[in-house]
């Protein structure tokens, strides 16, 4: 596949994860200025329509546990000597290299459990709380009920609480994740709209599809900010 602009940083991170014994990410087999070859991770990426076995509370907890293992392995990686892609807001950066794109399509499942993260192109200095906020937005999901058409409908706050408490974050970390939800939403969709405006057709098509639900999700998160913080306790 084509290499991303900050591929050297990404490859160093993946090599570190492998050396640390983390088996939940691909390994680099070959790389050049234009293309890279990574190992194939057997399983099924959680692409829409999401399979029923990825919608269970057990699957939700497995995503949180996968992130927890990733953050533990990444904690000893020093990002200082590399250039990284788009930075996250400074108030949510701790120095840990977070994945920053914990979209369902970037998580590989096997037998109803999350077993690997893929697509580290947006990875960069961030925090565990930032990743947890991002993952929870997608996996709770933190959306208006009219945009949830599966068994998760009506359970966003309950599932958010489950995810936070399975993430391994301290109480302060969980509160930080709750505080990061709207900022993470804005950061994510700024990338989409900027890429669409720059003429990338795939992003333009995606934005036309999600603009309405994204706006409703942001309003939902703002309206429920106190509830999100309460779930962190």
Where are these regions (language model features)?
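A conserved alpha-helical element in kinase catalytic cores
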Residues: 1-73, 77
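Active-site acidic catalytic loop and adjacent metal/ATP-binding pocket
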Residues: 28, 88-134, 141
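Short, polar/flexible loop-turn hinges at active-site or ligand-entry regions and domain interfaces
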Residues: 49-54, 124-126, 143-148
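Conserved kinase catalytic-core helix
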Residues: 49-84, 95-100, 105, 109-110, ...
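Short, structured loop/turn "capping" segments at alpha-beta junctions
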Residues: 77, 116, 127, 142-146, ...
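Active-site activation/catalytic loop segments of kinase-like enzymes and analogous catalytic loops
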Residues: 132-168, 184-195
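Eukaryotic Ser/Thr/Pro-rich intrinsically disordered, low-complexity regulatory regions
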Residues: 177-179
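ATP/Mg2+ or Mg2+-diphosphate-binding catalytic cores
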Residues: 188-233
């Amino acid at each position: 596949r084509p290499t991303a602009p900050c591929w050297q940083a990404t490859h160093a991170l993946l090599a570190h994860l492998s050396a640390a014994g983390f088996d939940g990410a691909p390994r680099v087999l070959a790389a050049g200025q234009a293309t890279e070859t990574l190992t194939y991770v057997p399983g099924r990426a959680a692409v829409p329509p999401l399979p029923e076995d990825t919608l269970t509370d057990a699957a939700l907890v497995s995503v949180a546990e996968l992130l927890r293992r990733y953050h533990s392995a990444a904690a000893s990686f020093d990002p200082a000597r590399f250039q990284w892609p788009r930075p996250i807001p400074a108030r949510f950066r701790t120095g840990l290299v977070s994945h920053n794109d914990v979209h369902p399509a970037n998580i590989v499942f096997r037998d109803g459990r999350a077993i690997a993260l893929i697509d580290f192109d947006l990875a960069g200095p961030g925090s565990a709380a930032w990743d947890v906020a991002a993952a929870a937005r997608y996996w709770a999901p933190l959306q208006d009920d009219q945009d949830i058409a599966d068994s998760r409908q009506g359970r966003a706050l309950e599932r958010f609480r489950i995810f936070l408490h399975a993430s391994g974050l301290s109480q302060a970390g969980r509160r930080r994740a709750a505080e990061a939800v709207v900022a993470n939403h804005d950061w994510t969709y700024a990338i989409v709209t900027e890429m669409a405006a720059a003429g990338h057709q795939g992003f333009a098509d995606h934005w036309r599809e999600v603009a309405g639900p994204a706006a409703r999700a942001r309003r939902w998160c703002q309206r429920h900010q106190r509830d999100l913080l309460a779930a962190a306790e």
